[in-house]
Regions:
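Catalytic-domain carbohydrate-binding cleft regions of carbohydrate-active enzymes
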Residues: 1-309, 315
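Accessory, solvent-exposed terminal regions and/or long lumenal/extracellular loops of proteins
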Residues: 309-391
Length: 391
């Protein structure tokens, strides 16, 4: 999908190609120097604005819009109301994006309570430094407490951050987000191949892993929709009775089965080795994704990771749906299912639901979707994995 960034507060001005048609639709003559003030409280204005500002781009394949920097400086509130502009515009843009049977979507800044209904939240023009990376990790997890489940950060930072190691570590955090998205003021250039061979290889491995994990990620997002659970979960959401769950903001659950604790400090040596302390919740077995090393839950471990890895753990005893790498992971159908299982404890019996639909339209609301239960059991030393018929 193509998404375009928009700063709409100036409306349609007299220097723009669509100005004459817009003015005529508004019942006014197109005269140089004459402009209509952007007015989100006027339905006629907004209908004409959406039509003439967006229609041409929509026909070229734009799926939805990134509403940027629309902070109440034309009017203090939406005219005729006491509502701030941002949540109202997020509502309008969300509904506009639903045309042609597409799902409503958008990127935007946080607009206050209730705003989670519409956009994927954009966290603003962040500075590129280690403290900001650390802050975004905690923000993403704790905002789920307010129903804000999906974030689209400027990975690497919008300003500054001319550090290849920092860039690679930020992308590792992006692996465990609803959106793995790059954006900056333009200097430095955030494209992964601009950061030297070591960082580029690290980032490439993250993008490839993101593709392989997409069946799990998409199924987990479906769970957000049906069960109202955040995608990035502070540890106390799943383990409210554990005191340690409240003491470790550096880590979070990504769906039911993955635990991440991204590196937020500079490493040492040529391999950029950095350490991170991780609390592993009790009553489960955990496996380091990169090394495969097994840990019993209910303890702290200190992970030393070079630039090509970070503390990423998988809960044992569950089937996790994956796929082979594909370079068009969101538009290609799932053709080859990979079910990865990390051994659980004796007697384990658990399931995971793989969810599939077309990824773009609202046809799933009419039942055009599939859920496939994956079962795992370990009994008397015998492991059994079952892929049940899709429903």
């Amino acid at each position: 999908s193509v998404v375009l960034n928009e700063h709409p507060h100036d409306g349609i001005r007299d220097h723009e190609d669509m100005y004459p048609a817009f003015m005529k639709e508004m019942g006014q003559e197109p005269v140089q120097g004459k402009n209509i003030v952007f007015d989100a409280g006027d339905k006629k204005y907004m209908d004409a604005f959406m039509k003439h500002a967006h229609e041409e781009s929509d026909k070229m394949g734009v799926a939805f819009w990134w509403l940027d920097w629309q902070q109440d400086y034309v009017y203090p509130v939406v005219r005729g109301t006491n509502m701030k502009h941002l949540p109202w515009l997020n509502h309008l843009y969300f509904n506009y994006s639903k045309q042609d049977n597409l799902r409503g979507a958008g990127f935007s800044r946080w607009g206050g309570w209730g705003d989670h209904r519409h956009p994927i939240q954009f966290s603003g023009d962040s500075g590129g430094n280690w403290n900001m990376l650390k802050f975004e990790i905690e923000l993403t997890a704790t905002s789920g407490n307010a129903g804000c489940f999906f974030w689209a950060h400027d990975l690497g930072g919008f300003y500054g951050g001319e550090d290849a190691e920092l860039m690679a570590r930020w992308i590792q955090f992006g692996l465990l987000n609803s959106s793995l998205r790059l954006h900056s003021v333009g200097n430095p250039d955030r494209r992964p191949w601009k950061w030297g061979e070591q960082a580029e290889n690290s980032m490439r491995s993250v993008y490839h892993l993101r593709s392989r994990l997409m069946p799990y990620i998409y199924s987990s997002v479906r769970q957000c929709h049906t069960d109202m659970l955040p995608l990035n979960r502070a540890m106390y959401i799943e383990y409210p009775g554990e005191e340690d769950a409240y003491k470790n903001p550096q880590e979070f659950l990504f769906g039911d089965l993955l635990l991440g604790a991204p590196i937020t400090t500079a490493g040492k040596g040529d391999a950029k080795v950095a350490e991170q302390r991780v609390w592993l919740p009790p009553h489960d077995v955990w496996y380091q994704f990169y090394s495969g090393k097994k840990y019993d839950g209910g303890q702290y471990v200190t992970e030393s990771c070079d630039i090509n890895s970070f503390p990423l753990f998988v809960k044992g005893g569950y089937p996790m749906p994956m796929q082979p790498y594909t370079d068009r992971m969101t538009s290609a159908d799932l053709k080859t299912l990979v079910v990865r299982c990390y051994p659980g404890s004796e007697g384990a019996s658990n399931s995971f639901s793989l969810y599939e639909d077309d990824g773009m339209t609202r046809d799933y609301e009419q039942g055009k979707c599939a859920s496939t239960r994956l079962d795992y059991s370990l009994k008397d030393g015998v492991t059994e994995i079952t892929v049940n018929p899709a429903e």
